[in-house]
Amino acid sequence: MSIMQVEVVSSEQNIYSGEASFVVVPTVQGELGIYPRHEPIMSLVRPGALRLTVPGEDKEVLVAVSGGVLEVQPDKVTVLADVAVRSAEMDQARAEEAKKAAEAGISQAKDDKALAEAHKALAAAIAQLKTLDYIRSHKK
């Protein structure tokens, strides 16, 4: 089985570093499925669920990403995410509350910095909600 090295890093921490046999990344062009030996590309990441298939494990590793940059090399995938959260750390109620707070922050922003922070928080909340929806729709 072919494998590749995958790094998912946010501005706060290293979220995932290890091997994978398949990765799905939400990009601005749509979901991109990546196998080992993929052609080199770079793309912008959109909010959503990043999915990793780890060799020898029967379940996917899920990470909510709010945006960022994807770099693909034949033997390595790197995602530099604005915000990234492992699925085990997510909570539906907290994500919904964060989305409401971010939407309020956008409407009440007094300057560009506050508006940018509110948009960043909204993207993070949307990414978590999309990941939680994916988990719910794929339960066995």
Swiss-Prot record:
SUPFAM superfamilies: Epsilon subunit of F1F0-ATP synthase C-terminal domain (SSF46604), Epsilon subunit of F1F0-ATP synthase N-terminal domain (SSF51344). InterPro entries: ATP_F1_dsu/esu_C_sf (IPR036794), ATP_synth_F1_dsu/esu (IPR001469), ATP_synth_F1_dsu/esu_N (IPR020546), ATP_synth_F1_esu_C (IPR020547), ATPsynth_dsu/esu_N (IPR036771). GO terms for cellular component: plasma membrane; proton-transporting ATP synthase complex. This is ATP synthase epsilon chain. PANTHER family: ATP SYNTHASE DELTA/EPSILON CHAIN, ATP SYNTHASE EPSILON CHAIN, CHLOROPLASTIC. Gene3D superfamilies: F0F1 ATP synthase delta/epsilon subunit, N-terminal. It is a peripheral membrane protein. It comes from Neisseria meningitidis serogroup C / serotype 2a (strain ATCC 700532 / DSM 15464 / FAM18).
